[in-house]
UniProtKB/Swiss-Prot annotation:
Gene3D superfamilies: 3.30.1360.40, Ribosome-recycling factor (1.10.132.20). Belongs to the RRF family. Responsible for the release of ribosomes from messenger RNA at the termination of protein biosynthesis. May increase the efficiency of translation by recycling ribosomes from one round of translation to another. The gene is frr. This is Ribosome-recycling factor. The lineage of its organism: Bacteria, Bacillati, Actinomycetota, Actinomycetes, Mycobacteriales. It comes from Corynebacterium kroppenstedtii (strain DSM 44385 / JCM 11950 / CIP 105744 / CCUG 35717). Disulfide bonds: none annotated. Keywords: Cytoplasm, Protein biosynthesis. One of its GO terms (molecular function) is ribosomal large subunit binding. It is found in: Cytoplasm. One of its GO terms (biological process) is translational termination. Coiled coil: none annotated. PANTHER family: MITOCHONDRIAL RIBOSOME RECYCLING FACTOR PSEUDO 1 (PTHR20982:SF3), RIBOSOME RECYCLING FACTOR (PTHR20982). It comes from the Bacteria.
Amino acid sequence: MIDDTLLESEERMTQSVEYAREDLTTIRTGRANPSMFNGVQAEYYGVMTPITQMATISVPEPRMLLIKPYEPSIMNAIENAIRNSDLGVNPTNDGQVLRVTVPQLTEERRKEMVRLAKSKGEDARIAIRNIRRKGMDELKRIQKDGEAGEDEVQAAEKELDKTTHEYVSQVDKLIEAKEKELMEV
């Protein structure tokens, strides 16, 4: 029972860190990055489809993306989806590919993005701590029900605290790296 509780808590903490990592990739850094289009969808045969599944996206220059649709007929749909997204970029259509120039971020916008990254990091930390709290409650229940002794439960609580600290530290490193990336000019 104790091992199951620890394992389940660790799996959920891993999921929280992965979610935070993916969430942070959506924050624009002023550099061209194909993952900035992960949330953008365009209509494709009547179905909303991520543009990452409709085209190849490459980075020929640090601040430019090339989007080459698999079918030329969907060029306008992709172009409109990018224009209507909240990414703040404007694609140029040359008939074969879409060119997207990523504008340089202003200092104020960079600081705003850092605040957003820190906020997302704090959300991940809170999620990890909530997982810890649920794990601790479960360990106390196990002890109360007589399924494990006090020493075993205390050892498991220490292990859960150690695991929590490791995962919070991973989130801190992600935020630190994102902040460094954002503040680079």
